[in-house]
Amino acid sequence: MDELLRAGFAALGLPLDETALTRFETYYELLDERSKVMNLTAIHGETDVAQLHFLDSAALLTVEPLAGKSVIDVGTGAGFPGLPLKIAQPDISLTLLDSLDKRVRFLGDVCAATGLTDVTCLHTRAEEAPELRGQFDAAVSRAVARLYLLCELCLPFVRTGGVFLAMKGPDCAAELDEARSAIRKLGGTDERTARYTIPGTDVTHSVVVIRKTAPTPPKYPRRWAKMQKEHL
């Protein structure tokens, strides 16, 4: 895994020191071990995890500078993209949010085993965390949901002037068109869409960069069922 990560980070133009390498190795070992008894990821094996989880997540740092920023990862699952971002950029102040308690406990175990600090692991739903409203420089998400839904879940967490980075597949133009009304109503502007190929693979992903230009109206986010039923 070391050589894959060294080559991948070099291809992305990102630094990678020995501490980060050790942390990635520890993260992989825990992920591999726990995936045998709980549903954490469908991606297995050193090569695929290194490329499709670790490098894919770290590639966000080539899209938007996050050094010294407060970042919330919404619907983080097994910690992607948040934990690889934190390992690659340790001065990020990170909050990991997930609705499943056993995943949140796993994330806490990873932080303890890797020695990561300034990481908060929260067991809650995004629409049920009003105390976090407007508290972050950036929100990130690789969750599998339509962009308009992710925007309603994530943009309320972002301070005005901050950014929401939504990780998507190679072609998200139609999904972005579908979300533009929601982005505007939630106080955002779709600034640009960045694309990258994961080093060592032919997999191309997109990141929709949404700038928070105004406060999100207090009535958002709505309950999940209403979000799905009544498209913004």
Residue ranges, per PLM feature:
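Class I SAM-dependent transferase core
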Residues: 1-68, 72, 102-119, 223
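S-adenosylmethionine
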Residues: 91-95, 99-232
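Residue-level marker of intrinsically disordered, low-complexity segments enriched
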Residues: 69-72, 85, 95, 207
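Conserved SAM-binding loop of SAM-dependent methyltransferases across substrates and taxa
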Residues: 78-91
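Conserved glycine-centered beta->alpha loop in an early N-terminal alpha/beta scaffold
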Residues: 75
